[in-house]
Amino acid sequence: MPDTREIPAGTLVRRLWSSDRDAVVGLFRDLDPDSRFDRFMGAVSEAAAAAYASHAVSAEGLVFGAFADGILRGIGELRPTGASAEAEIAFTIAPGHRGRGLGAALGARLAEAARNAGTRRLHLRCLPGNRRMRALAQRLGAEFRLGGREVHAVLALSPPTLFSLWREGIDGVFDAAAAASAAWPTVPLV
């Protein structure tokens, strides 16, 4: 898989925790109807998207967020499929922040976490008209399978290495520190 970790200055990609729930709900609530249609592969109301988002961080799997200037602008979700060594990934990027490398950076973190957990294949599904998602899947190195009314991309992962395990561990320490710092109450200096 190509290295896709280059992200714009002022952007932080980290794991999301329950303390990030309100930011995730806000991101989904701010999606326009076309963005919700692309994300859920069908018409979904703002309320339904917000209801999904309220459980996204606590659901089984992992969720990473991309913060631009301290504001959550994108998330990547890694969800087990039930099949051994396989998982599904999904992305939500705020409309004004697409095409800036956030999806690729989130995809790299998701792929590394999945491979280190023993996952061998990641699946990504999107509508044929969602060209940004197809481009992201291609950038991540996925192979495409066309079927019916959706595009199915499969990303084969190599086994973990000592370096990939070490890097994920270091990233995890920084993720926890960044999340704790963001959740810490602000104390005004007098």
Task: Tell where the protein language model's regions lie, with residue ranges.
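Acetyl-CoA-dependent GNAT
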Residues: 30, 38-88, 94
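Terminal substrate-recognition subdomain of acyl/acetyltransferases
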Residues: 1-9, 125-126, 131-190
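A short beta-loop-alpha structural element at the N-terminal edge
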Residues: 12-23
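Hydrophobic alpha-helical core bundles mediating ligand binding, dimerization, or RNAP-core interactions
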Residues: 25-28, 32
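Hydrophobic adenine-recognition pocket in adenosine-nucleotide-binding enzymes
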Residues: 16, 93, 126
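Conserved acetyl-CoA-binding loop-helix of GNAT-fold acetyltransferases
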Residues: 93, 99-114, 121, 131-135, ...
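Short strand-loop-strand
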Residues: 32-37, 111
